[in-house]
Amino acid sequence: MAVNFPSIDPAQLHPVAGVTLGWAEANIRKPNRKDVLVISVDESATVAGVFTENRFCAAPVIVCREHLAKVRAGGAGIRALVVNTGNANAGTGEPGLVNARETCAELARLAGIEPAQVLPFSTGVILEPLPIDRLKAGLPAALANRKAANWFDAAQAIMTTDTLPKATSRQVTIDGHTVTLTGISKGAGMIKPNMATMLGFLAFDANVAQPVLDTLVKEVADRSFNCITIDGDTSTNDSFILIASGKSTLPAITSTDSPAYAALRDAVTEVAQVLSQLIVRDGEGATKFMTVQVEGGKSVAECRQIAYAIGHSPLVKTAFYASDPNLGRILAAIGYAGVADLDVDKIDLYLDDVLVAKAGGRNPAYQEEDGQRVMKQSEITIRVQLGRGDAQATIWTCDLSHDYVSINADYRS
């Protein structure tokens, strides 16, 4: 029940020079579906990532962090990524780590690279052993299937409860040079800031030094995947990866102070925001896409704190599902967000262009039918003005429906 989900034409997903993708059906959890993905990158590439902040992080997340640390310490660069769906390899203890490392070793053997040059990713059911033999058996087919144009198939290969594959692509001009950016993502539940059950892979052909890419991935994640919430749960497996293949004619970006870096950051952020918003639009059972804007704060942090209190609230989300203008729930969420010195008498609340609350109380001119008119729309903006500064923050969320319960109750059946 995706909300205004754009039609994705596979032909419009630009290949990124130096990146190939292959998939296989390995029967990890269900038969006859793509469930293994291999992404290969040329030696010229640099790779960086950010991962879940869940302390119960999955085995592949641990291994990814280890392998990227070796790259930063001067080791050989990352040459391949491998993803399986249907099983999260989380809550699996030492055997899970063994399986994640064995996956890397097997792919490295087949591809003629080192195990530490492979990053593993898993998504699916937690607390179940990874069927390592099936995963390994699928790797040769995925390698043989690699093509530069396989982005749409790759998006399909990483889906779990997603109803639609998520992908987008751009070409931009930086200092007179064309840069191609293409990315895929997955996720429909267990989504909140600081990553969630979400995978995102975004490649572009610019040449970016490793320390610069490490900064870029954090800045981009903070403006995109860390600005979405569906149900407030944070998963064990979430990962967001940037791949800079180095094949563009754009001169190498070696400093975050350069104009080229700023232009690239803006382009990558735009693509990442589309990928993250597609996750919200395909949120489990979602019928409405909501933008929460908090303005006039003392800091971005407090604006986000309030925005997430609104976006996480089951009472707010169910009110929007029902188109019920019980909008005191939003004020309550603002109040419990934890901003200690908030002056509620300065707060204004808008639904789109409708002023609901003014100076901390109901706007005398507000009519409930005006609020309901907005809430019946499929796309809604909740705007809060705090009246205490110039900072602002925006997040994206969705409503909470009966179908959300059904999807998650039936997930393992």
Curated annotation (Swiss-Prot):
Name a biological process GO annotation: L-arginine biosynthetic process
Compartments, record wording: Cytoplasm
Q: What class of enzyme is it?
A: transferase
Record-annotated site: Cleavage: 196-197
Q: EC number(s) for this protein?
A: 2.3.1.35, 2.3.1.1
What does it catalyze? N(2)-acetyl-L-ornithine + L-glutamate = N-acetyl-L-glutamate + L-ornithine; L-glutamate + acetyl-CoA = N-acetyl-L-glutamate + CoA + H(+)
- A matching Pfam family: ArgJ
UniProt-annotated site: Involved in the stabilization of negative charge on the oxyanion by the formation of the oxyanion hole, residues: 123-124
Q: Where is the active site?
A: 197 (nucleophile)
Listed GO cellular component terms?
Answer: cytoplasm
- Binding, substrate: 160, 186, 197, 284, 408, 413
The record, for Gene3D superfamilies, names:
ArgJ beta chain, C-terminal domain, L-amino peptidase D-ALA esterase/amidase
Q: Does the keyword Acyltransferase apply?
A: yes
Which GO terms fall under molecular function for this chain's record?
A: glutamate N-acetyltransferase activity; L-glutamate N-acetyltransferase activity
What the protein does comes down to: Catalyzes two activities which are involved in the cyclic version of arginine biosynthesis: the synthesis of N-acetylglutamate from glutamate and acetyl-CoA as the acetyl donor, and of ornithine by transacetylation between N(2)-acetylornithine and glutamate.
Annotated family: Belongs to the ArgJ family.
Q: Report quaternary structure and partners.
A: Heterotetramer of two alpha and two beta chains.
User: What is the protein's given name?
Assistant: Arginine biosynthesis bifunctional protein ArgJ
What organism is listed for this UniProt entry? Burkholderia lata (strain ATCC 17760 / DSM 23089 / LMG 22485 / NCIMB 9086 / R18194 / 383)
